[in-house]
Amino acid sequence: VRPLNCIVAVSQNMGIGKNGDLPWPPLRNEYKYFQRMTTTSSVEGKQNLVIMGRKTWFSIPEKNRPLKDRINIVLSRELKEPPQGAHFLAKSLDDALKLTEQPELKDKVDMVWIVGGSSVYKEAMNKPGHIRLFVTRIMKEFESDTFFPEIDLEKYKLLSECSGVPSDVQEEKGIKYKFEVYEKNN
């Protein structure tokens, strides 16, 4: 079973969203990091796959949907067919993960990335097995209505370094942030 990767940017008060958007002003380099991490495949001829909830899908500006050069799976119990632009629809995270093991996808997919929202992160983080959390810590509080679940530090260890992840504090638009990676293997 392939490892599962979650990627998220979170404010000091654990906020990840506000009114269907990010709680902070656009941070171009942070977004580039998200693009690079979720798009870059380590295997020639394979693509990464992103899994997201319906609200996360619709929070992406239409011109940026689907997330390009990645296979996009949207989760929804209500929708009957994939929203326009999405490659696949699944009823649950488990169904989406089963889909990645089907013959049509098994040999096409390199890394699997969970890109939101809260409930999808929570379910992924509580699954058994090898899971990595790529967390951008926005070092400031922002009013939010959607939050990231607490990271259980009994289970998850903060890695001191991870290839491709800058270790120094970043700053854009007067907002400082840093990239962290947590991992569990059980």
From Swiss-Prot:
Keywords: Acetylation, Cytoplasm, Methotrexate resistance, Mitochondrion, NADP, One-carbon metabolism, Oxidoreductase, RNA-binding
Record's signal peptide: none
GO cellular component terms, A-Z: cytoplasm; mitochondrion
Keyword RNA-binding: yes
Keyword Transmembrane helix: no
Catalytic activity: (6S)-5,6,7,8-tetrahydrofolate + NADP(+) = 7,8-dihydrofolate + NADPH + H(+)
Modified residues (Cysteine derivative): 162
Pathway assigned to this chain's UniProt record: Cofactor biosynthesis; tetrahydrofolate biosynthesis; 5,6,7,8-tetrahydrofolate from 7,8-dihydrofolate: step 1/1
Residues holding substrate: 30-35, 70
CDD domains per record: DHFR
GO BP annotations listed: dihydrofolate metabolic process; folic acid metabolic process; one-carbon metabolic process; response to methotrexate; tetrahydrofolate biosynthetic process; tetrahydrofolate metabolic process
Modified residues (N6-acetyllysine): 32
Pfam families assigned to the protein according to its UniProt record, in alphabetical order: DHFR_1 (PF00186)
Subcellular localization(s) per the UniProt record: Mitochondrion; Cytoplasm
Residues annotated as binding NADP(+): 9, 15-21, 54-56, 76-78, 116-123
Domain DHFR: 3-184
Residue positions, PTM N6-succinyllysine: 32
Record text on subunit structure and interactions: Homodimer.
Described purpose of this protein according to its UniProt entry: Key enzyme in folate metabolism. Contributes to the de novo mitochondrial thymidylate biosynthesis pathway. Catalyzes an essential reaction for de novo glycine and purine synthesis, and for DNA precursor synthesis. Binds its own mRNA and that of DHFR2.
Family classification: Belongs to the dihydrofolate reductase family.
Protein name (Swiss-Prot/TrEMBL): Dihydrofolate reductase
UniProt source species: Sus scrofa
Upper taxonomic lineage: Eukaryota, Metazoa, Chordata, Craniata, Vertebrata
Gene name of the encoded protein: DHFR
